[in-house]
Amino acid sequence: MNAELVKIELKVNGKKVCKYVAPSMRLADFLREELHLIGTKKGCNAGECGTCSVLINGVLKKSCMIPVIKANHCEILTIEGIGTDGLSIIQRCFIKAGAVQCGYCTPGMIMAATTILKENRHPDKVEIRRRLGGNICRCTGYVKIVEAIELARDILNHDQSADCLDSIVPDTGKIIGSRIERVDAKGKAAGALEYAADMTMPRMLHVHLVR
C-alpha cells in the first residue's frame, strides 16, 4: 500500500465508508471518483459557483475546497441522499416550477434550498435570494429557482397541497403553451444525469493540458 495514503472513515448518505486516500484529495473528487456520486458537480473548482455543495454534519459546504481528510468521521449528505424514497418535495418543486434547465447547477441549488428550508420554515423571497448567493445559475436568472423554493416552503408548511406537483397533460392533449415536465428533469434533479465529465469507461485515458 502506498505509504502516502491515509485511512478515512465517514458516513455518506447514511452508509459507512472506509477508504485510503491521498491527503491532498478534495472531498468533491473523493465523492465523484471514489464513490461515483456524480451528482456533486465541479464547476469553478474554486469555491465560487456552488455546484459542488454538500452537507457536512448538516452544514452546507463547498466540497471542492475541502480536503477529504477534513471530513474524516463526518456525515456527508449529497444530492443522491436527498430523496431516499424517490424525489424529495424540494426536488419535485424544482421540476414543477421549471427551475431545472441545463441542470448543471441544480444539485447544488437543491442542497442550498434544503438547507434554507431546514433552518427557516418560513423564508421570504428576500431571504431566499440572499441565501442563494453562494450558488451561481447561468440559465434561469434565479426567478424559477426562487419560485421552486417558495412552492416547497408552502407545501412543507401545509399551506398548499402536494397534489399540485403531479404532472398533468392538458385534457386537449395539446402541450404548446402549457408548462409540462421536461423529459430529463427528474434525472437532473436527482443528480443522476451524466455530463461529459461524469462519463467513465474501462481503461479510460486522461489528458492533462500543460500551457
PLM region spans:
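Signature of N-terminal electron-transfer/Fe-S-associated modules in redox systems
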Residues: M1-C164
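Flexible, low-hydrophobicity surface segments
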Residues: D154-R211
